[in-house]
């Protein structure tokens, strides 16, 4: 059976924290800011941790990423 490969798209979007959790950036941040209020835009700047329900799937994509 061939080696698993790291999913390059996922690898560019997710970073591992010191405690081993996965950090990701938020969606809805590329355009259409006139329709979003200031609080919403401020909260979108903050990074978010990958949820527990998605963790297994994302870890498979990042098989060898440290």
From Swiss-Prot:
Compositionally biased tracts (Basic residues): 1-16
Gene Ontology biological process: translation
The keyword Ribonucleoprotein belongs to this UniProt entry's keyword annotation: yes
Highest rank taxon of the organism: Bacteria
Xref: HAMAP family: Ribosomal_bL35
Family recorded in the similarity comment: Belongs to the bacterial ribosomal protein bL35 family.
Protein name: Large ribosomal subunit protein bL35
Species of the source: Staphylococcus epidermidis (strain ATCC 35984 / DSM 28319 / BCRC 17069 / CCUG 31568 / BM 3577 / RP62A)
């Amino acid at each position: 059976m061939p080696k698993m490969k790291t999913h390059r798209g996922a690898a560019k979007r997710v970073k591992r924290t010191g405690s081993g959790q996965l950090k990701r950036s938020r969606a809805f941040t590329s355009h259409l800011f006139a329709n979003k209020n200031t609080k919403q835009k401020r909260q979108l700047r903050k990074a978010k941790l990958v949820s527990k329900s998605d963790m297994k799937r994302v870890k498979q994509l990042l098989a060898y990423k440290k």
